[in-house]
Structure formats: C-alpha cells, structure tokens
A protein has these predicted regions:
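Short, solvent-exposed loop/beta-turn-alpha elements that line the ligand-binding surface or hinge
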Residues: 1, 40-57, 66-81, 120-161, ...
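Sec-exported extracytoplasmic/periplasmic mature domains
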Residues: 19, 23, 40-43, 72, ...
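Periplasmic-binding protein-like
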Residues: 76-136, 142, 146-168, 209, ...
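Extracellular/periplasmic solute-recognition and catalytic clefts
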Residues: 5-73, 103-108
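Bilobed periplasmic-binding protein-like "clamshell/Venus-flytrap" ligand-binding domains
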Residues: 100-103, 170-203, 254, 300-337
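Pocket-flanking alpha-helical
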Residues: 12-17, 33-46, 237-272, 317-318
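Solvent-exposed, polar/charged alpha-helical surfaces in well-ordered, non-transmembrane soluble domains
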Residues: 2, 12-20, 36, 65, ...
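Ligand/substrate-recognition segments at binding pockets and active sites
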Residues: 9, 145-160, 170-257
C-alpha cells in the first residue's frame, strides 16, 4: 500500500463506513450492538464473513469509576478512616452492579475486574493468587458481604446494608435504614442528607459501559436516603475540565496502559507534596506508604518482586476507595472483506502487536 488516508470520525460512523464502503478498516467499540450489526451485515450470524472480517484482542487498558478524595471526604481529611469509609459506601453499591451492566453492554466481549490494572499486565492479580478479593466485597467490620448462594437481588440488598454501615463509620446518622445526616451532622440539601454527582461521557444517550452501573446504583442509594445525580455528558471535554478543576465527585472513564505496569504516573503523589505533571490529580491520593512502594518497585528488574510490590500498591489504592475497577474489554479491528486482501494483513495480531505494525504489507483487492 503506497498511500493510507487516516480519518477522524464519530463512533457511530465507524462500522457504517466499512459496511457502506467509505472506510476499509476501522476500530468500533465492540459492544453487543456492534456485534449484532456486524453479524447482520455478514448475513451469516458471524463476525467474520463476506462483508466484514473481525479481529479481537484484549484492550491494553481498563474501565473504571473514579472518585476524588479532595471532594469525597469527611472534615477535609481525604486519607482518614472516616473519609475512606464514606467513599467505600458508594463504591460498594457501585461494585455490585458491575456484573449485570458489563454483561448487558459487552456480553462475553468484556469481563469484570477487581483491581485497578489491566488484565493484560503480568502484574495483574489472578483469582488463584493468595489474598485476592472481589472489589468492595467486605463490610465496615471487614466481614464478607456476599455468600456464594445469594441471588442477584439478595446481593443488591446486602450491598445497601453494607453501605449503611460504611456511612455510619464515616460519621453519618442512620435511622430506620436511611441516612438522615451527613458526617458533619447536617444535610447536603434540603431534601437529602447526602447528595453527590457522577459524571459520565455517554454521548448524552446513555451509551457507555458504566452507565447502567451508575443509574442502578443511583436508584438503590435512593432507598437509603442518598441522592446520586448521574450526569450524562455529550461532550467528554466537560468531564476532563471538571476533574482538572478538582470539582468532580465521581466520574466514569478508562485508562490506557503500557507494557510495563509502572504506577508512578497515576498514583504517585510526591514525597514532598503533590508531584507535578502526573495524573494523581484524578484521585488525589496522598499516601506515603504507596509512594515508597511505587519507587521501590520501579527501581527493581525482578518481575516476581515487582509483582508483589504492585499487589501491595493495588491493595492501598482499593483501600482509599477512589477507584472502582469495572471492566477489561476486547478491542476489535474490522476489515472490509470485499476490499482488503486479508492474506496480506498481519496474521498474529496481539494486544501489543497490531495490524499497523505491518501496514506496509496490506494490499487492497
């Protein structure tokens, strides 16, 4: 191929472009709706066919729901036990709706994760590892919230009861199964003891993997007197502007990862105050032990040692309750079977080696 024309386009136009012939190769979000549309275009109930050929790999990154420790805290002490409990109340309810939401949006093309790290990383904890826990699955007393025989509805109710325990630990007053005061002893608004807002860039139409999590959690929290406002943004720049201004309570987003799982950029807060130029402003974690572990881990070449250090880091991050890990999704690259000579496309595409790595070999029919 001598010339390649790269086009910036809207998500809705990616698949349609390949189907209609205006685009040869694209990378649509691989949602259940996208899969259905590809199968329909191929007319063979398969994502590979006469119209479209699909290649999938695990995404080098993951989706999450974040919280700012600077806005979501008690008595302006982001790292206190009370502040962590306050955030864990919300995180517990959010976490319990991950399974149903991700299954609804992605189907089998994504999985729920329990630590804030991509499953593509060698440092990602595995279910068989010692100390592995489902995210936000213990109550304020450190006891398991769920049992293996619980139904989904029973889990939702158990999460609410656990949230009440965390709100009490944060200093809120709870009466008859409802939160009746915030940690300061008053009310956030005339109608609610606690009112918070979650921002989600779902194109103004609920098109986001975490949208169902937030809306279901909002309905559930309402039952215990807590108001979670879900704001669906049509322009994602509003999300980043609000986060950077340190005015966001909660937000849905995703991290891109690198081959090396170094956590310095996102979680290091600086040994003598906030580190300039990093991404720690997203959560405002300020934890001396976490800082030391991050520096120790990045100073070593021993992968086994680093994995142990990073697991300790992840446990601290989860304890701060500023990030609810949500999903590990698959990436899809779709090719026009009619126009692209698939024999010339990279045969062994992986998370780390994409079709662009051998773009010089790609030919059109």
């Amino acid at each position: 191929t001598k010339y390649v024309n790269f086009l910036q386009t809207q998500e809705d136009d990616k698949l349609n472009g390949v189907i209609t012939g205006t685009v040869d190769i694209s990378d649509p979000s691989f949602s259940a709706n996208t899969v259905d549309a590809i199968k329909k275009a191929n007319a063979n109930d398969d994502v590979n066919g006469p119209k479209i050929t699909t290649d999938t790999v695990d995404n080098l990154g993951y989706g999450y729901i974040g919280m700012s420790a600077n806005t979501m805290n008690v008595n302006n002490e982001p790292g206190s036990d009370a502040s962590k409990a306050y955030r864990k109340a919300f995180a517990t309810v959010l976490a319990v709706y991950r399974d149903v939401a991700i299954d609804s949006y992605y189907g089998e093309r994504a999985s729920v994760i329990n630590y804030p790290i991509s499953n593509t990383s060698w440092a990602a904890p595995q279910a068989s590892d010692p100390g592995y826990k489902v995210a936000f699955s213990v109550d304020a007393d450190g006891k398991d919230i769920y049992t293996s025989d619980m139904t989904a509805d029973q889990k939702y109710e158990a999460a609410l009861q656990a949230a009440l325990g965390f709100f009490e630990k944060a200093g809120c007053k709870v009466e008859n199964g409802k939160v009746v005061s915030n940690p300061a002893g008053g009310k956030d608004t005339d109608a609610y003891a606690i009112e918070r807002e979650a921002l989600i860039p779902a194109d103004g139409k609920g098109d986001h993997p975490s949208f169902m999590i937030l809306t279901e959690a909002s309905k559930a929290l309402e039952k215990i007197g807590v108001h979670l406002i879900v704001t669906d943004l049509s322009d994602s720049t509003q999300l980043w502007d609000t986060i950077e201004a340190d005015q966001a309570d909660m937000f849905a987003a995703a991290w891109g990862a690198t081959v090396d799982p170094d956590m310095y950029q996102i979680y290091f807060s600086g040994m003598d105050g906030k580190a300039a130029g990093g991404s720690n402003y997203m959560y405002d974690i300020n934890d001396a032990e976490l800082n030391k572990l991050i520096l120790d881990a990045r100073a070593s070449l021993d992968q086994s040692y680093r994995k142990t250090m990073y697991k300790a880091c992840l446990d601290i991050i989860v304890d701060w309750a500023v990030e609810v890990p949500v999903y590990q999704r698959q990436n899809a690259v779709i090719f026009s079977t009619e126009r692209v000579n698939m024999e010339t496309v990279t045969p062994d595409i992986t998370t780390f080696y994409g079709w662009l790595s051998e773009i010089q070999n790609v030919e059109l029919n």
